[in-house]
Swiss-Prot record:
UniProt source species: Bacillus anthracis
Record SMART domains: ParB (SM00470)
Protein purpose: Effects nucleoid occlusion by binding relatively nonspecifically to DNA and preventing the assembly of the division machinery in the vicinity of the nucleoid, especially under conditions that disturb the cell cycle. It helps to coordinate cell division and chromosome segregation by preventing the formation of the Z ring through the nucleoid, which would cause chromosome breakage.
Protein encoded by which gene: noc
UniProt xrefs under Pfam families: HTH_ParB (PF17762), ParBc (PF02195)
Portion annotated as DNA-binding: 153-172
A molecular function GO annotation: DNA binding
UniProt keyword list: Cell cycle, Cell division, Cytoplasm, DNA-binding, Septation
Protein known as: Nucleoid occlusion protein
S-adenosyl-L-methionine in keyword set: no
Length: 290
């Protein structure tokens, strides 16, 4: 079943030109294939809109060995942006594998796409592969929202995802860079990162991040730690003070003034006031000898 890219993101007559298929999300409709060309690798640059920021060297090496054995079955897809200069639309992993093999040229199909279309294809193609980290996925959603001026709900409908899925991913982008880096490097999981969001305070978030990594805290332990920190941060409730009658105030002030007069006379008087629910207690100590 085809997931027509142009229908989802409103590229009008481009529908017949570019389609993504469930069987191979990088595959361009064969009916509109241009002739495959051999393009020098030095003339090709990665997609500037590529959401993937971390490439697994081991998996690229595996792909390179497969290509060496079986050849490059699926050409990469590029667009020309200057004379003899091309930008990858789809197939950066294949491009990297071919580069690792030392190829001078790589089979490619040239498509005529503008910046918005190129960015959208790269983002959608990677999202459908479900190999992105949580942060890369969040960045891809944010870019699609900006490119097509969509709401979270509209994007969710176009991608066939729940709005809460989109919203939860986008919240990760508000976290400090150190936490996002930890997610990219897979030092912590997405659930760890999401547990940190309620803390708000960046210093506390980074403190807990350090604890997660150093103590190898699981998600439950992390959530319990954060719950404790949130409880500690709550303002303490002040005890409700009962109204004091005028007569009581006069009595207290009279006693205090009397004690001050005694002290002024040179006698060392110690006093202590205590407040209870129903009464005040004043304890006075007067020395027998001056």
């Amino acid at each position: 079943m085809k997931n027509t890219f142009s229908r989802l993101f409103g590229f009008g007559d481009k529908e017949s030109e570019f389609e993504l298929q469930d069987e191979s999300h990088e595959e361009i409709d064969k009916k509109v294939y241009e002739e495959i060309q051999e393009i020098p690798i030095v003339n090709i640059t990665p997609n500037r809109y590529q959401p993937r920021t971390v490439f697994d060297d081991a998996r690229i090496e595996e792909l390179a060995l497969t290509i060496r054995t079986h050849g490059l079955i699926q050409p990469i897809v590029v667009r020309q942006y200057e004379d003899d200069k091309y930008e990858i639309i789809a197939g950066e992993r294949r491009f990297r594998a071919a580069t690792k093999l030392g190829w001078e040229k790589v089979p490619a199909i040239i498509k005529n796409l503008n910046d918005t279309e190129t960015a959208s294809v790269a983002l959608i193609e990677n999202l459908q592969r479900e190999e992105l980290t949580a942060i890369e996925e969040a960045v891809a959603y944010q870019k699609l929202i900006e490119l097509h001026n969509l709401t979270q709900e509209a994007l969710a409908q176009r991608l066939g995802k729940g709005q809460s899925t989109i919203a939860n991913k986008l919240r990760l982008l508000k976290l400090p860079e150190e936490i996002k880096s930890a997610l990219l490097e897979k030092s912590i999981t997405e659930r760890h990162a999401r547990a940190l969001i309620p803390l708000k305070n960046e210093e506390l978030q980074l403190k807990v991040l350090q604890e997660i990594v150093e103590k190898q805290l699981n998600v439950k332990q992390t959530e319990e730690r954060i719950t404790k920190l949130l409880e500690e941060a709550k303002p303490k409730r002040k005890a409700k003070q009962k109204a004091v009658s005028r007569d009581t105030r006069i009595a207290m002030n009279t006693i205090r003034q009397s004690l001050q007069m005694v002290a002024d006379s040179g006698l060392n008087v110690n006093s202590e006031e205590e407040e209870f629910d129903e009464y005040y207690q004043i304890t006075i100590q007067i020395p027998k000898k001056k």
